[in-house]
């Protein structure tokens, strides 16, 4: 089998810039630092960061968010749902660096098949969404783990979102992938995965783990029997 990466386009990639704006992380870091200071001065058992929902009694240390190496452009903690489909990227978000703490990064998306330039098409069609209801996932060891949905920090509930990309259709055209010579090749589109750091539960403790999410749509080829180049 031969794998071909589908032509990248705005709706199948991580939001423009391949990273959450620095302003968002700066604001997040400021809030976490504030939560840490309050946690140190609060009575025992009254820490300001805890898991919401079914595991609301489990405490999460705000220091978990301080390490830059744990950040991923496909994982976002936000107090508001990211836009499902934004017309354009908000220039003020990156240009001025004045994004409010609970704003999310906006990126250009389209519900129809994208065309970069006239006559150019993607081999496979993909769709990208922010997933905010993930409860379980497969970690890098192949084990199913619990994913934390919400974290309460300083009385603000931050939800954990994942930017996932998957194939819209395994066969965008009758013969399989778009633009493939069906006389010599069998083809189909398939969703591929990668691993990102996500906040999960490890026993009764919150911990970062690599979990698998959908991140791309690629074309898989196999040569038809009896055909030679």
Curated annotation (Swiss-Prot):
A 1-acyl-sn-glycero-3-phospho-(1D-myo-inositol) binds at residues 161, 197. GO terms for cellular component: axon; dendrite; endosome lumen; extracellular space; synaptic vesicle. A 1-acyl-sn-glycero-3-phospho-L-serine binds at residue 197. Disulfide bonds join 124-189, 167-217, 177-219. Residues 7-109 form a propeptide. Residues 77-112 are annotated as: Disordered. Keywords: Cleavage on pair of basic residues, Disulfide bond, Endosome, Glycoprotein, Growth factor, Lipid-binding, Metalloenzyme inhibitor, Metalloprotease inhibitor, Protease inhibitor, Secreted, Signal. Its main location: secreted. Residues 1-6 form the signal peptide. Glycans are attached at residues 57, 102, 154. PROSITE patterns: NGF_1, NGF_2. One of its GO terms (biological process) is neuron projection morphogenesis. It is found in: Secreted; Endosome lumen. Nerve growth factor is important for the development and maintenance of the sympathetic and sensory nervous systems. Extracellular ligand for the NTRK1 and NGFR receptors, activates cellular signaling cascades to regulate neuronal proliferation, differentiation and survival. The immature NGF precursor (proNGF) functions as a ligand for the heterodimeric receptor formed by SORCS2 and NGFR, and activates cellular signaling cascades that lead to inactivation of RAC1 and/or RAC2, reorganization of the actin cytoskeleton and neuronal growth cone collapse. Homodimer. The homodimer interacts with a single NTRK1 chain. The homodimer interacts with a single NGFR chain. The NGF dimer interacts with a single SORCS2 chain (via extracellular domain). The NGF precursor (proNGF) binds to a receptor complex formed by SORT1 and NGFR, which leads to NGF endocytosis. Both mature NGF and the immature NGF precursor (proNGF) interact with SORCS2 and with the heterodimer formed by SORCS2 and NGFR (via extracellular domains). The NGF precursor (proNGF) has much higher affinity for SORCS2 than mature NGF. This is Beta-nerve growth factor. It comes from Sus scrofa (Pig).
């Amino acid at each position: 089998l031969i794998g071909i990466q589908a032509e990248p386009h705005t709706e199948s990639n991580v939001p423009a810039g391949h990273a959450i704006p620095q302003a968002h992380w700066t604001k997040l870091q400021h809030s976490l630092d504030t939560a840490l200071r309050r946690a140190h001065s609060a009575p025992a058992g009254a820490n300001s960061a805890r898991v919401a929902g079914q595991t609301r009694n489990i405490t999460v240390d705000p220091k978990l968010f301080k390490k830059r190496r744990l950040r991923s452009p496909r994982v976002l903690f936000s107090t508001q749902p990211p836009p499902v489909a934004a017309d354009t990227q908000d220039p003020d978000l990156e240009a001025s660096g004045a994004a409010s703490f609970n704003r999310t990064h906006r990126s250009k998306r389209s519900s129809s098949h994208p065309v970069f330039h006239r006559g150019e098409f993607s081999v496979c069609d993909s769709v990208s969404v922010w997933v905010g209801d993930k409860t379980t996932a497969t970690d890098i060891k192949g084990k199913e783990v619990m994913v934390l949905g919400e974290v309460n920090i300083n009385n603000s509930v931050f939800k954990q979102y994942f930017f996932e990309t998957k194939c819209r259709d395994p066969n965008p055209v009758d013969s399989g992938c778009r633009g493939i010579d069906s006389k010599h090749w069998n083809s189909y589109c398939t969703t591929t995965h990668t691993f990102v750091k996500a906040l999960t539960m490890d026993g009764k403790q919150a911990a970062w783990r690599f979990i698998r999410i959908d991140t791309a749509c690629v074309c898989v080829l196999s040569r038809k029997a009896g055909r030679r180049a």
